[in-house]
Swiss-Prot record:
Similarity-based family: Belongs to the DNA mismatch repair MutS family.
Coiled-coil ranges (or none): none
Taxonomic classification: Bacteria, Bacillati, Chloroflexota, Dehalococcoidia, Dehalococcoidales
Gene3D superfamilies the record matches: 1.10.1420.10, DNA repair protein MutS, domain I, MutS, connector domain, P-loop containing nucleotide triphosphate hydrolases
Protein name: DNA mismatch repair protein MutS
DNA-binding as UniProt keyword: yes
Keyword Transcription: no
GO function term, MF aspect, one: damaged DNA binding
Biological role stated in the UniProt entry: This protein is involved in the repair of mismatches in DNA. It is possible that it carries out the mismatch recognition step. This protein has a weak ATPase activity.
GO biological process: mismatch repair
Length: 858
């Protein structure tokens, strides 16, 4: 360290406190990175890697970015999961002896971003904190850009569903704990010392933050794990933000039982937030329903989809509001136009509180507040009864508007310092400084004209740069006419630059005025933000009301465009959907092309539907559309059907498709069985089960046996009786309906004509005993030879008696037992009571006997 420069010592002292972050070290007009940070920055940001001498014989890797381009480069690093420590100069050159003082003013991580251009407008940016035990979990989340702060305590089995629903950008855990993330989720994992998760420490942190004596008012006193997670989250935010967290003024405590539950597989299988094919918004349910016009509405829609309601009265309130907008097309159209002019008031309110909002954004806020007044005149003065519940927070804020109008210019720049942010007349002293700066500019223009005339040098010009200040520039060709009082300041290739005593005097005057102007404008702007901060709660209330109106009117717009209907809820444990449709598939096919289907499920008479039929005929679509209609109804949306009579569903489970969990060392079949076990162990009589091809991941007989046992279990367990759609390629399962009274068979209708097969996509009663797999293979484009040979093999398998061996070179003969001898196998066959066997049991017995015969060499 003896040969290290003071600047490097300063950097190393700061860097040691942020070993996991890239340190952006402010040096004048640049943020510099050093050593390994520089190598990472150069690689990820595609900037030049150079070096700087920072001690005797010591050259250190260096890569820098201009300070004004920070947000652009910052977003690229954060999106790749890096953390960045912003180290600023906190004193001015000359104010202190030696180096300018520097300190980290903020640690930017994926879960603590607040800059508008780094955030997804219609998606929350959640930081998630977890504290795990063997069978339970404390969970807390916060979005500091919107002031949301919540927590819960749940069993470990429901954790993955909550993580998928929240889709956090960053997760914090104690150092001694680990977590397997859902396969689709890309979140940064940050580790905290376990000390911050200790119950007493975390509780004290929360009490201090909320300035209260206990947590009973928040409803989490009996959630020790949730308290641990929430307290640790607060600590992490304080460490990263280096500022007050006053915007987190409420803690929303909830339980997963408050809402319909869907695990991560269900969210993925039903394509709620993203399509399975392109992993994008297009093709998802969110993509269909999101006709929202505001950022707040878009985020609220995501919340609705992740937490369908279980309280019928709350659902009916939403449906009644959708009714209003469905019927009142002029009101819906007018509102949509107004909402399109509303900025992200929720995030703006928080940036006002944090004093990070830009002057130009205040004009956008002003325009939004004017639109709020117009919307209030339309709906708030005489609220339509069906909207009244959602209009409570909608109130004009004329005082806030007045403050912005009186203090901020109509077209302010993004930054402070030029005297163009604060409106003239607001502060007399600042007006004087602005006038002085303006007069100086006029003086310099006049001086340039005067010096040209005095010297006769027509090309003479006055200029300014940050290094040399103000100067007079004369080309080399005119240096002979230069007056003697000009003092040389800089030599260029084709010109020389000079100063004069008069110019230097005005330079000092102007620079002092600009410095004072920056200080004064900054101070006045902060005063304005303090005043606007007094409207924080009212601004958030308006944002919440507008978000609700946005989502509910969007539901109506989607319903009108796609001919959806209002669902009806009843207390019986049944659902009855007439001409139901799959919302995403229908849109992909185009209007009128989708084949609608009915479904009736009831705990009393049709609890389980066994659905058979060929692949690609529409089984999965039918299963999924039923679940989607139930979900849509419980978020308060109209549904794609002719009629829909539903009961409240507490959970939707789906077991669809095949996938491996390589990270856990689990095969496709093991994953299938784990998911099936979870469903059977947690479903209730009010659940909806969507089971597709259970048992296909193992041998035919094992799979068939498991599939049958699962159906029998769902049917026979008194505490279960969940409404179930069970699609299968095991045609033998249709026999279950003969002795399980609440099992019904349905199949996909198929038309055959002269060897051509047409899938009608219509669900009809009854089972099928024929597969059309080869036809599907033909549609997929397999070679004609393969298709022809497959039909030959199929014929042989279906008619074994007619099968003729291709070669008869060696035909071993069976050794028949001698007269009077009886084998054990024969005795077992004789003892069979064939009349009491079901077809499926007989098939299983035949398989068993065949296996024994092979073992005996028969």
């Amino acid at each position: 360290m003896e040969n290290t420069t003071p600047l490097r010592k300063q950097y190393l002292d700061i860097k040691k406190n942020y070993p996991e972050a890239i340190v952006f070290f402010r040096l004048g007009d640049f943020y510099e990175t050093f050593e390994e940070d520089a190598r990472i920055a150069a690689r990820e940001l595609e900037i030049v890697l150079t070096s700087r001498e920072m001690g005797k014989g010591l050259k250190v890797p260096l890569a820098g970015i201009p300070y004004h381009a920070l947000d652009n480069y910052l977003s690229r690093l954060i999106n790749k999961g890096y953390k960045v420590a912003i180290c600023e100069q906190v004193t001015k050159p000359g104010e202190t002896k030696g180096l300018v003082q520097r300190q980290v003013t903020r640690l930017v991580t994926p879960g603590t971003v607040v800059e508008p251009n780094l955030l997804q407008t219609k998606q929350n940016n959640f930081l998630l904190s977890l504290y795990l035990t063997e069978d339970s979990c404390g969970l807390a989340f916060a979005d500091i850009s919107t002031s949301e702060f919540g927590c819960t305590q749940t069993n470990i089995g429901e954790l993955e569903a909550e993580i998928s629903r929240l889709s956090p950008a960053e997760i914090i855990l104690p150092k001694n704990q680990s977590l397997n993330l859902p396969i689709h989720l890309k979140a940064t994992i940050s580790k905290l010392d376990g000390y911050y998760f200790e119950a007493d420490i975390a509780r004290e942190h929360l009490l201090r933050h909320f300035e209260c004596q206990n947590l009973s008012a928040y409803g989490c006193e009996n959630m020790p794990l949730a308290i641990s997670a929430a307290g640790a989250l607060l600590n992490y935010l304080e460490e990263t933000q280096k500022s007050s967290l006053k915007q987190l003024e409420r803690l929303s405590v909830y339980t997963t039982a408050d809402y319909m539950q869907m695990d991560s597989h269900t969210l993925s299988n039903l394509e709620i937030f993203r399509s399975s094919g392109g992993n994008s918004l297009k093709g998802s349910l969110l993509g269909i329903l999101d006709q929202t016009r505001t950022a707040m509405g878009g985020r609220l829609l995501r919340k609705f989809l992740g937490q369908p309601l279980l309280k019928q009265s709350d659902i009916e309130k939403r449906l009644s509001a959708v009714d209003y907008f469905f019927e009142e097309s002029l009101a819906r159209t007018s509102l949509a136009k107004s909402l399109g002019q509303i900025a992200d008031m929720e995030r703006m309110a928080n940036r006002i509180r944090q004093k990070t909002i830009l002057p130009r954004e205040l004009i956008s806020l002003k325009n939004s507040l004017e639109t709020v007044s117009a919307i209030h005149r339309q709906f708030g003065l005489m609220p339509p009864p069906r909207l009244a519940y959602f209009l409570n927070g909608l109130k004009p804020l004329p005082e806030m508007l007045d403050i912005i109008n009186k203090t901020i210019t109509d077209d302010p720049p993004s930054t402070l310092g030029d005297g163009k942010v604060i409106r003239a007349g607001f502060d007399p002293e600042m007006d004087k400084l602005c006038s002085l700066a303006g007069d100086a500019r006029t003086f310099l223009s006049q001086m340039e004209t005067r010096e040209r005339e005095r010297t006769g040098i027509k090309s003479l010009k006055l200029g300014y740069n940050r290094v040399f200040g103000y100067y007079i520039e004369i080309s080399n060709a005119n240096l002979g006419d230069m007056p003697p009082e000009f003092i040389r300041k800089q030599t260029l290739v084709n010109a020389e630059r000079f100063i004069t005593p008069e110019l230097k005097e005005y330079e000092n005057l102007i620079l002092n005025a600009k410095e004072r102007l920056l200080e004064m404008e900054t101070g006045l702007y902060e005063q304005v933000l303090n005043q606007l901060g007094g409207f924080y709660s009212a601004l958030l209330a308006n944002a919440a009301a507008l978000a609700a109106l946005d989502v509910l009117s969007a539901f109506a717009e989607v319903a009108v465009r796609n001919s959806y209907v209002r669902p009806v809820f009843h207390p019986e444990n049944r659902l009855d959907i007439r001409k139901g449709r799959h919302p995403m598939v229908e849109q992909g096919l185009g209007y009128g092309s989708f084949v609608a289907n009915d479904i009736s499920l009831s705990a009393e008479d049709c609890q389980i539907i066994i659905l058979t039929g060929p692949n690609m005929a529409g089984k999965s679509t039918y299963l999924k559309q039923t679940a989607l209609i139930v979900l849509m109804a419980q978020i308060g949306s109209y549904v794609p059907a002719e009629t829909a009579e539903l009961c409240l569903t507490d959970r939707i489970f789906t077991r669809i498709g095949a996938r491996e969990d390589l990270s856990a060392g689990q095969s496709t079949f093991m994953v299938e069985m784990v998911e099936t076990a979870s469903i059977l162990n947690t479903a209730t009589s009010r659940s909806l089960l969507i089971l597709d091809e259970i048992g296909r991941g193992t041998s035919t007989y094992d799979g068939l046996a498991i599939a049958q046992a699962v159906v029998e279990y769902i049917h026979s367990q008194p505490s279960l009786t969940a409404k179930t759609l069970f699609a299968t390629h095991y045609h033998e399962l249709v026999e279950l309906a003969s002795y399980l009274p609440r099992v019904k068979n349905y199949n996909i209708a198929v038309s055959e004509d002269r060897g051509e097969v047409v899938f009608l996509h219509k669900i009809v009663p009854g089972g099928v005993d024929k597969s059309y797999g080869i036809h599907v293979a033909k549609l997929a484009g397999l070679p004609k030879w393969v298709i022809k040979r497959a039909y030959e093999v199929l014929t042989e398998l279906e008619n074994p008696a007619k099968k003729q061996p291709k070669s008869r070179t060696c035909q071993p003969q069976l050794q028949l037992p001698m007269t009077g001898q009886t084998s054990v196998l024969e005795e077992e066959i004789k003892e069979l009571e064939i009349e009491s066997l079901t077809p499926l049991a007989a098939l299983n017995k035949l398989y068993e006997l065949k296996k024994k015969a092979e073992e005996q060499g028969l």
